[in-house]
A protein has these predicted regions:
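C-terminal long alpha-helix characteristic of the crotonase
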Residues: 60-65, 107-140
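Hydrophobic/aromatic residues within transmembrane alpha-helices
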Residues: 4, 52-53, 110
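Acidic, divalent-metal-coordinating active-site segment for phosphoryl/phosphodiester hydrolysis
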Residues: 47, 102-109
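Conserved active-site and cofactor/substrate-binding residues in soluble primary-metabolism enzymes
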Residues: 21, 81, 105
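Phosphate-coordinating loops and pocket residues in cytosolic domains that bind phosphorylated ligands
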Residues: 1, 10, 100, 112, ...
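CoA-thioester-processing core
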Residues: 26, 30-32, 40, 46-99, ...
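Glycine- (often His-adjacent) and acidic-residue-rich active-site loop
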Residues: 1-27, 45, 73-75
Length: 140
């Protein structure tokens, strides 16, 4: 999940600003949701998709998932709050490395730096199981 870069490149300055504001409003609504919100991640979680996952209370991933914030390599940065949320979650040094190097990291590395909470074979099933057993404190 993320933005279609062809669409982004076609936006005027005012349209790009509005797109960023709408994305920020959505991510903030997810962050403020009164119950835990789980991101079940499989495949690629990049850019805006990573911003979405960062807005959630918990991130559960499959073993083959790949994460990254490659905007710097593409000459852009998402405006959906990832640049603020990622350092809070993984620390300034790890976030800076992800932003500047713009390299993809594995699920195992994401777990090591605290980007994800668990690696499981069935992220969706695990998220549903955890939601059904809500009672853990919320984390951001």
């Amino acid at each position: 999940m993320g933005a279609d870069l062809r669409e982004i490149n076609a936006l005027s300055g005012a349209e790009a600003y509005e797109f960023a504001r709408m994305g920020q409003a959505l991510m903030n609504a997810i962050t403020r949701f009164p119950a835990p919100v789980y991101a079940a991640i499989e495949g690629h979680c990049m850019g805006g998709g990573l911003d979405l996952a960062l807005s959630c209370s918990y991130r559960i991933t499959g073993p083959s998932a790949v994460f990254g914030h490659r905007g710097a390599a593409l000459g852009l940065m998402t405006g959906w709050g990832g640049t603020q949320r990622l350092p809070r979650l993984v620390g300034k040094a790890n976030a800076l490395e992800m932003f500047v190097a713009a390299e993809r990291i594995t699920a195992a590395e994401a777990l090591r730096i605290g980007l994800v909470d668990a690696i499981v074979e069935d992220p969706v099933g695990e998220a549903v199981r955890r939601i059904q057993n809500v009672g853990s404190p919320r984390r951001h």
